């Protein structure tokens, strides 16, 4: 079972209103991941109602709300609270990071990002989620 989970392509939901960033993340992830994207909190919530991704990646600055708002919504949802959340943003102050973690984010990556680092962080979040699930 562990091997099949390792070989399965991870499902990622990326929430960012910047087309350039969405394209860059798609290019960075390549074929090893299934990427779905949303441009706003509203689009993200509709996507999350349809499926539960392996990892949710969101920008702090969204056109209709903040990434912290999305984090809070996900953490309050019994169906989604298990989904690991990574914030991927240009906001880099300690206060921004603390706000993200307090809202429920599991990881915080500052743009610009290195593709290998992003992939490593996504895989780590997925592995932690899997270990928590296996422990019951």
Label each PLM-derived region with a short phrase.
Residues 18-37:
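Two-component/phosphorelay signaling modules centered on CheY-like receiver
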Residues 37-55:
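Acidic, metal-coordinating helix/loop segments flanking the phosphotransfer/catalytic sites
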């Amino acid at each position: 079972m562990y091997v099949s989970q390792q070989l399965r392509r991870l499902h990622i939901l990326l929430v960012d209103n910047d087309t350039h960033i969405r394209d860059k993340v798609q290019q960075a992830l390549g074929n090893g991941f299934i990427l779905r994207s949303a441009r706003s909190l509203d689009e993200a919530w509709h996507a999350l109602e349809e499926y539960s991704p392996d990892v949710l990646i969101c920008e702090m600055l969204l056109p209709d709300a903040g990434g912290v708002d999305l984090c809070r919504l996900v953490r309050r949802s019994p169906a989604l609270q298990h989904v690991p959340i990574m914030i991927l943003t240009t906001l880099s102050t300690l206060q921004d990071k603390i706000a993200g973690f307090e809202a429920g984010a599991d990881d915080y990556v500052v743009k610009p990002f290195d593709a290998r680092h992003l992939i490593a962080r996504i895989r780590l979040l997925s592995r932690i989620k899997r270990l928590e699930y296996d422990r019951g």
